[in-house]
From Swiss-Prot:
This is RING finger protein PSH1. Coiled coil: none annotated. Present with 6490 molecules/cell in log phase SD medium. It comes from Saccharomyces cerevisiae (strain ATCC 204508 / S288c) (Baker's yeast). It is found in: Nucleus. GO terms for cellular component: chromosome, centromeric region; nucleus. GO terms for biological process: proteasome-mediated ubiquitin-dependent protein catabolic process; ubiquitin-dependent protein catabolic process. The modification Phosphoserine is found at S143, S191, S403. PROSITE patterns: ZF_RING_1, ZF_RING_2. SUPFAM superfamilies: RING/U-box.
Length: 406
């Protein structure tokens, strides 16, 4: 089975063999200078560049972290020589050697020069201009809440201070990875059991930090919410945050106190508003009760009166009743739907007139000596609603109580 590809390749046509060979030669070309990699160097992320191009790339980015030119991943370890690609290119050049071709001679000269440069730098221990010798890493100190420190002098690194120059403030060493960043958590690198242990460890560390800085940590509602949020939070933290996490938790605790004070003030304002509205509504009910009692007193006084109507007045009333009946009939004929009739309107109008008469009688001064004539003067608006006919004045003779005196 180990020689399966060998046998298949031998039986392929020339076109297939040429395509495979062309792809192999393409993998020997540097993506920066687009020339053959006589000294191919492989970065930790797996990309390959020639030694000269990668050396120039590191030298031109002295104020930034060392990163891959293609994927921008941090290069924390020195790139290694890719001997496999180097052997491929050397074998192809050996088979295609042509001493009479000037271009081929130039190609071999370039190959020899680059290989010698690499050998000399390696012997002198000056690979990549000593950039990896003179630089340091930002590492997390697990024994001190994961605080980021310089790998050379172990000085604490503040991301705000090293953000611009990316240099250790103590030993002035170049930090070749981002001091304030956090490695991306790759769940595929761990088994399910290991992932559970990591989640539990992170949850306990988060709870301990929260309990040490939050004054509400002992409350059940806060602790339960923290547990829920910690379980649902994505697995993005690979190292603890150190003192920055503690300062962040302190700010969360202060915000929680301010929010609780604001809620208490809102509740007090709502209670005061409800109390004011309640007093206002109760005053209206008291006024309505007072008006109703006054109206009942007036109506009861009117009920105790006896009204005596003279003959002339009876004749006038009969004539008026006849006219009202005619008017009611005409009114009902024009309303075939039967929803409203003149009789019902008269009864409603009589009730309105009676209440208004009671109100008018309350305002008058009721003083009688013997018998007196009382005129019922209705409002102009009431008469317009009742009947468009001219106003009529009715005379009444009122007897108070059971007295025979007029």
């Amino acid at each position: 089975m180990g020689d399966e590809l060998h046998n298949r390749l031998l039986h392929q046509n020339d076109g297939t063999k040429d395509a495979i060979l062309y792809k192999i030669i393409e993998s020997l070309v540097c993506s920066i200078c687009h020339d053959y990699m006589f000294v191919p160097m492989m970065t930790p992320c797996g990309h390959n560049y020639c030694y000269g191009c990668l050396n120039t790339w590191f030298a031109s980015n002295t104020q930034k972290e060392l990163a891959c030119p293609q994927c921008r991943s941090d290069i924390t370890t020195i790139p290694a020589l890719n001997t496999t690609l180097q052997q491929y290119l050397s074998f192809i050049l050996e088979k295609l050697r042509d001493q009479n071709d000037e271009s081929f001679k130039k190609l071999l000269t370039t190959k020899t020069k680059e290989e010698n440069d690499y050998k000399n730098d390696k012997e002198k221990d000056t690979l990549f201009d000593k950039v990896f010798k003179n630089s340091a890493l930002a590492v997390a100190d697990d024994s001190d809440d994961g605080i980021t420190r310089c790998s050379n002098c172990h000085w604490e690194l503040d991301p705000d201070e090293v953000e611009d120059g990316n240099v250790c403030p103590h030993c002035n060493a170049r930090i070749r990875n981002y001091a304030g960043g956090r490695d991306e958590f790759d769940e595929e690198e761990y088994s399910e059991g290991e992932l559970d242990e990591i989640r539990e460890s992170m949850r306990r560390r988060r709870e301990n930090r929260f309990a040490s800085t939050n004054p509400f940590a002992n409350r059940d509602d806060v602790s339960s919410e923290d547990d829920d949020s910690s379980e649902e939070e994505p697995m993005r933290e690979h190292i603890p945050l150190g003192r920055w996490a503690r300062s962040h938790n302190r700010s969360i605790a202060v915000d929680a106190v301010d929010d609780e004070d604001d809620e208490e003030e809102d509740e007090e304002e709502e209670e005061e508003m409800d109390s004011d509205l309640k007093d206002f509504i109760e005053d209206d009910e008291d006024d309505e009760d007072e008006d109703g009692s006054r109206r009942n007193l007036v109506l009861s006084a009117l009920k105790n009166r006896h009204v005596i109507i003279t003959d002339d007045e009876e004749e006038e009333q009969r004539r008026h009743a006849t006219e009202e009946e005619d008017r009611d009939s005409d009114f009902y004929e024009h309303n075939d739907d039967g929803f409203v009739s003149g009789d019902s309107l008269d009864e409603d109008q009589k009730e309105v007139t009676r209440i208004q008469s009671s109100s008018d009688s309350e305002d008058r001064s009721l003083s009688y000596s013997g018998s007196s004539d009382v005129k019922d003067n209705n409002d102009d608006n009431t008469e317009e609603l009742d009947d468009p006919q001219p106003k009529r004045q009715k005379r009444f003779r009122v007897v108070l109580g059971d007295s025979d005196d007029e």
